[in-house]
């Protein structure tokens, strides 16, 4: 990272994030905490834009930043779906959803039921070269043990880099 900081008062955080994002398999996550409204999300967004500028060429090996808001999330499947949509933006398009519904209906008419299959049965959500940012931890509707346990699977079992943003006081 350059010597020029957007946040001179937070240089120690930027320096640590420089160190963390350079690790191959850190085996721990980073928690960025502070009161609501102090700019945690803004800070991490600007930091990531600075160290990983927008990719011009898809063949470049710039890590993909996967930023997920946990606000209102009730299940790990919801998190999986958001991650898959970040990796595969075409999944967000109405045409893709409509095609999926039509395909599912056709299979059901043939006696094949896909209701028990989940999106992550078809897509890998763990990419160690990417950086996962889980924002709004305190606003997640899952029990804290369940949400942190699930996030831990990215770090401990899949060697992913994870930054969690939240307000410990809430």
Would you name each region that the model predicts?
Residues 7-27:
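Pre-Walker A adenine-sensing motif
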Residues 66-75:
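A short hydrophobic beta-strand->loop->alpha-helix junction that borders the nucleotide-binding pocket
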Residues 40-62:
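P-loop NTPase Walker A phosphate-binding motif
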Residues 92-121:
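Glycine- and small hydrophobic-rich membrane-insertion segments that are intrinsically disordered
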Residues 24, 117-130:
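Short basic/glycine-enriched coil/helix segment immediately N-terminal to the Walker B
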Residues 74-97, 104:
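Conserved NTP-binding/hydrolysis module of P-loop NTPases
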Residues 26-45:
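Walker A/P-loop nucleotide-binding motif
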Residues 125-169:
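Conserved Walker B catalytic segment
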